[in-house]
Amino acid sequence: MTRSYRITLLPGDGIGPEIMAVTVDILRAIGRQFDLNFEFEEALIGGSAIDATGEPLPEATLATCRNSDAVLLAAIGGYKWDSLPRSQRPETGLLGLRAGLGLFANLRPAAILPQLVDASSLKREVIEGVDLMVVRELTGGIYFGEPKGCFADEQGRQRAFNTMVYREDEIDRIGRVAFDIARKRGKRLCSVDKANVLEVSQLWRDRMTLLGSDYADVELSHLYVDNAAMQLVRWPKQFDTIVTGNLFGDILSDIAAMLTGSIGMLPSASLGAEGPGVFEPVHGSAPDIAGQDKANPLAQVLSAAMMLRYGLDEPEAAARIEAAVNQVLDQGYRTGDLYSEGMTLVGCKGMGDALLAALESPVSA
């Protein structure tokens, strides 16, 4: 029986339209194989939305996203809009989208593909076999805490302050997401905090420990954030799933991303309690190569795989896409960001064609 899904496409800026076009072709091919009907609707966000409407997130875009089963985003931003006030820049469209959809959990996988192990700056024996997931809380912590501000004190010196605050319900909901993901992966969850000096982190640790009693099959551990950062570089294979707050997750997820050696390969997902999630590559809009058929579409394609797995509960279709990505890398196809001597250099469209061929091949099944 055919299963139908409404997907909002947000190509955005820079290389976004190019990598989105490849990904839509892949999803259509997957739909034929797995009897899935995707109803795609494209909408504006970021710089392209500013140019067309004057706003980085038009109300029509948010309404379309809310009416969908999942949102696939490509890239936002570019030099063209850097002179705008911060509150009007393209990136605020993404913040508004997350808030408008109630997204609070950011999933950032970092898996070392065997074909690209030498792209990492770490030694092969350290990095080989790494497959971890960082679950970051998105809507609380020091980025959103009140009060905050900047003022001149009695001596005329400028002072600035922010507030790091979490409620127990905010901690519990991100904790349950992380425990559920860990249960489906390696059944190991490391909670990262700074409970030795921060009261907010002590509450975080207490709530995670309490939640752990509901997940007896998941091994829970705790690390202070400074030690966690060190351990990610020293021996990343010790981690399976990491859960942490907004600030710490912002830092640790970027460390984890660079373990792989290429940010052009990394997908991400942002999820809420209900409604559609947003699935997007970690990389930016790369305006310097936009329109030149040089972009690497693999992170966008893998974001579509995450959409299938975490947004639409279609894990077999997701695995098929991931197998196709592995197959084209095995065959030596590389875009410019991954190219090395002896490989076959292809552009964005060429990589898409190779992926489509792999999907039709029984080798990737």
Curated annotation (Swiss-Prot):
Question: Bound how, and how many: what does the cofactor note say?
Answer: Binds 1 Mg(2+) or Mn(2+) ion per subunit.
| Stored Pfam families | Iso_dh
Q: Does the keyword Manganese apply?
A: yes
What residues does the record give for site: Important for catalysis? 143, 194
UniProt keyword terms in alphabetical order: Amino-acid biosynthesis, Branched-chain amino acid biosynthesis, Cytoplasm, Leucine biosynthesis, Magnesium, Manganese, Metal-binding, NAD, Oxidoreductase
Which EC numbers does the record give?
A: 1.1.1.85
Cross-referenced SMART domains: Iso_dh
Query: Where does this one sit in the cell?
Result: Cytoplasm
| Positions of Mg(2+) binding | 226, 250, 254
Top-rank taxon, per record: Bacteria
- Annotated positions binding NAD(+): 78-91, 284-296
- This protein's major location comes to cytoplasm
MF terms from GO for this chain are: 3-isopropylmalate dehydrogenase activity; magnesium ion binding; NAD binding
InterPro entries xrefs? IsoCit/isopropylmalate_DH_CS, IsoPropMal-DH-like_dom, Isopropylmalate_DH
Its EC top class is oxidoreductase
**Single Gene Ontology BP annotation:** L-leucine biosynthetic process
Catalytically driven reaction(s): (2R,3S)-3-isopropylmalate + NAD(+) = 4-methyl-2-oxopentanoate + CO2 + NADH
Cofactor dependency:
Mg(2+); Mn(2+)
Pathway listed: Amino-acid biosynthesis; L-leucine biosynthesis; L-leucine from 3-methyl-2-oxobutanoate: step 3/4
Q: Which GO terms describe its cellular component?
A: cytosol
> Where along this sequence does the record place binding of substrate?
98, 108, 136, 226
| Membership in a protein family | Belongs to the isocitrate and isopropylmalate dehydrogenases family. LeuB type 1 subfamily.
Q: What does this protein do?
A: Catalyzes the oxidation of 3-carboxy-2-hydroxy-4-methylpentanoate (3-isopropylmalate) to 3-carboxy-4-methyl-2-oxopentanoate. The product decarboxylates to 4-methyl-2 oxopentanoate.
Subunit structure and binding partners: Homodimer.
- Alphabetical list of PANTHER family matching this protein: 3-ISOPROPYLMALATE DEHYDROGENASE
Q: Tell me the protein's name.
A: 3-isopropylmalate dehydrogenase
Species per Swiss-Prot/TrEMBL record = Synechococcus elongatus (strain ATCC 33912 / PCC 7942 / FACHB-805)
The lineage is: Bacteria, Bacillati, Cyanobacteriota, Cyanophyceae, Synechococcales
In the UniProt record, what gene is named as encoding this protein?
Answer: leuB
